[in-house]
Every structure is written in structure tokens, then in C-alpha cells.
From Swiss-Prot:
Belongs to the transferase hexapeptide repeat family. Pathway: Amine and polyamine metabolism; carnitine metabolism. Keywords: Repeat, Transferase. It comes from Salmonella agona (strain SL483). GO terms for molecular function: transferase activity. Residues 179-198 are annotated as: Disordered. This is Carnitine operon protein CaiE.
């Protein structure tokens, strides 16, 4: 793992969190229990404070950063999809930010909300609970349904379980030169399916 102190501030990572070895954490970063941080994530706490609360996840290639004297926060059980950028914003408890979305400075995503993939949330946006945000710039499409929230929670549970699985089952290795006979498939821990398959 790549951890860097910056002007005396050292990242804080709970022992029950998983941080992929290729992720980079710099300075004022606080990572809670059961958090999953994926490959190539960049958390640059060289200006503002970056906080990932318990049970949240920050997936592959995500970026967290913020201006001085700001907190960029992913609250408990927050779910940040591949390639998303969080800059000086707050993601509420149990909310989901979809893949390659951008959440700008001073924006607040309400608890149990979903930001659709590829959305752009403008600076200063103040969301409410259970909003479905879509587009660039993002607009409120409607309320998140109970079914969608259940789907989100199953996905978040997968990442909470993945943090545990990676702490014990992930290791650097050399590749095989051929596919072995009867190669097994990996399984998740819930019955979650892609939205298109529901």
C-alpha cells in the first residue's frame, strides 16, 4: 500500500478496512471499519480532510480531494462506483454514486440517494433523502424506490464482504501460462444481480 505523511499528517486506516496495494493515501485521510478501497484509488488529503466512514466503499480508479478547510465525506455504508470523482463534497449515509460520476465542491448527496452513472453534480447542490439524480448536470428524476434501495444495499454488502475476503484471500502472484481444466468461478456473498438482469 502507498501511504504518505504530508506535513506531519498521516493517514488513519482502521484495521478492519481493506486498502488495495495500488491505492494511494496522502495526508489527512481517515478510513473507518469495514471500508473497501479498490485498486488505483487516489485519496489526496494534502489540502482538505477525506473521510470514509464505516462500511463504505471507494472502488477502482476513484479520486477523492478537496480544498483547504473542507471535509470530503462518504458517510456510513456509502457506495462509490468505479472511476467516480468526489471533490469537496458529502455523500450521505447509504447513498450510491454511480460509475464515472463527478460530485463537485460543496455538494451534498442525501442519505439513501442514488446518483446514476456518468452524472455530474454541480458545486453547491443540496440534496434530500432518497433522490435519484441523473444527467449532466444532474437533476432529480424521482424518489428512489424500495426495490432500488434494496439493490443498492445488497451491492454495498458485497463490498463489505469483499473487504473481509481480500484481507485473507488476496495475494500477489505470477500468472499461469494456460487455463487450467475445470477452472472454478468466483462467487459473491449475496444474490445481487445487475439492474438489467432484474
Amino acid at each position: 500500500m502507498s501511504y504518505y505523511a504530508f506535513e506531519g499528517l498521516i493517514p488513519v486506516v482502521h484495521p478492519d478496512a481493506f486498502v488495495h496495494p495500488s491505492a494511494v493515501l496522502i495526508g489527512d485521510v481517515i478510513v473507518g471499519a469495514g471500508v473497501y478501497i479498490g485498486p488505483l484509488a487516489s485519496l489526496r488529503g494534502d489540502y482538505g480532510r477525506l473521510i470514509l466512514e464505516a462500511g463504505s466503499n471507494l472502488q477502482d480508479g476513484c479520486i477523492m480531494h478537496g480544498y483547504c478547510d473542507t471535509d470530503t465525506i462518504v458517510h456510513e455504508n456509502g457506495h462509490i462506483g468505479h472511476g467516480a470523482i468526489l471533490h469537496g463534497c458529502v455523500v450521505g449515509r447509504d447513498a450510491l454514486v454511480g460509475m464515472n460520476s463527478v460530485i463537485m465542491d460543496g455538494a451534498m448527496i442525501g442519505e439513501e440517494s442514488i446518483v446514476a452513472a456518468m452524472s455530474f453534480v454541480k458545486a453547491g447542490f443540496q440534496g434530500e433523502a432518497r433522490q435519484l439524480l441523473v444527467g449532466s448536470p444532474a437533476r432529480v428524476l424521482r424518489q428512489v424506490t424500495d426495490q432500488e434501495l434494496h439493490w443498492k444495499r445488497l451491492n454495498t454488502k458485497e463490498y463489505q464482504d469483499l473487504a473481509i475476503r481480500c484481507r485473507t484471500g488476496l495475494s500477489e502472484t505470477k500468472p499461469l501460462t494456460q487455463v487450467e481444466e475445470n477452472r472454478p468461478r468466483l462467487k459473491g456473498t449475496t444474490d445481487v444481480k445487475p439492474k438489467s438482469a432484474q
